[in-house]
Amino acid sequence: MACLERIAAENPRINALITVAREEALAQAVVLDAEARAGRFRSPLHGIPIALKDAIDTAGTPTTAGSALFESRVPAEDAHVVRRLRRAGAVILAKSNLSEFSLTATNATSHFGAVRNPWALDRVSGGSSGGSAAAVATRMCFGALGTDSGGSVRLPSAWCGVVGLKPTDGLVSNSGIIPSVAILDTCGPIARSVEDVAMLFGQMVGYDAMDIRSIDRPAEDYASSARQPVARLRIGIPRKGYFDDLDPQTARCVEEALRVIGKLAGGVKDVTVPPVMEFLDAFVNAAEIYSYHEKMLQRQADADRYMPGTRKVLQWCVGYLEDAAGGTAAGKLARYIQAVARLESHRRTIDAAFTDFDVLALPTLKGSPPTLAEALQVEGADEAKVLVPIDNTLLFNVLGLPAVTVPCGFSSQGWPVGLMIGGPRFSEGRLLALASAYEQSTEWHERVPARAK
């Protein structure tokens, strides 16, 4: 299998993969090859090797969340989305590296070591699904799955020069996935092209009665949707707030991309979108994170095993919850219920905002990837403020909306830049169509890191 050769060549220097299921993958490939010779093809993913972020449960294969606490954790069952992929004939090749418990944005805080950016080894890949994006960029796998609670699929995809999709909340089941911020979490595909993302995504979507947030909708052929015309799409540009403080190199690439998609579609216009924190009370984030880690934090032997950057995030959560609700259990509960109610109200009404435009287009990130040294100096809760501002990506998690990032250029130093296209709920087909039209009008997605050619 060619991907195993790529892993042997690339993973020692990139550190994108934690576990390589070599024997299991080869056994799967033998079965699938026999089916293909007999004329049976399960789906477009038949025999295709993919990697899974190591927060997604795989039966009999360790799922560690990038943490020493879960180093020996071996699930008995596959996550719902993994079962769907296996039925579709995908070969589960490897488990990818991630920020510990998906809680930081650089991928420098993994128990298994930092993921390096394949375009510049002294730079971060972005996180928390950095291993998935780096593995795809270096051709260790056809595609990969990540999870996204604030940008964790799109952020590393942008900085690694690949395509990443954050779906509408509820289209892909979260059953069997270790949570980061459960109310914001989604599982999404990463691949080399929009077409590949569409094919992978089509096999991931499906109702799961075991996931309270799962949505039962008619199946859609996303690969076909990605080929639909885009000439009438109206593109909104939320410049105020979401284009502030752009790195000049990022601004150059994004503005040129907007010029291209404006010609492909029905034009662009500036629109106003409120700041993301008008929709989200940070108390929700703190409460969701702390609720998963509470018992481990109460056991000192476990608490001491967290990575320093993760520990800072958890300490911030504890302090914020105490300060924001006066320290009483009743106060915390009331604050959480009120904050979630406001969030759900915003989510129910947000589709009405898409009346004067069909999609939003904006920078995925506002600057270039920091160095690993910088990331290790500023770990934890300060990352989002100092190194990796995530307001642009977080907007779509908070509102439960889909968004896709596509490569739109390179800085003068050679680092990839991403353009993000987002829309109302269940508009994945529309977003993929515009992203595909843009991709076919440019050549950015064809570029690969030097050693991956």
Named regions from a protein language model:
Residues C3, A25, V197, I235, ...:
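Residue-level signal for inorganic ion chemistry
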Residues V30, D221, L246-T272, H293-D304, ...:
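Acyltransferase
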Residues P62, L395-N397:
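Conserved short alpha-helical elements in the N-terminal third of ANL/AMP-binding
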Residues A9, R13, R87, A137-D244, ...:
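Structural helix-boundary/capping segments
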Residues L69-V74, D185-R192, L314-T328, I421-G422:
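Short, well-ordered beta-strand elements within core beta-sheets of diverse protein domains
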Residues L45-A65, S224-P238, A287-D351, P363-L365, ...:
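Short helix-loop capping/hinge segments that flank enzyme active sites or metal/cofactor-binding pockets
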Residues M1-S149, R259, A352:
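Gly/Ser-rich catalytic/binding loops embedded in alpha/beta enzyme cores
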Residues A68, S72, R213-S214, D281, ...:
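Short, surface-exposed loop/helix-turn segments at secondary-structure junctions
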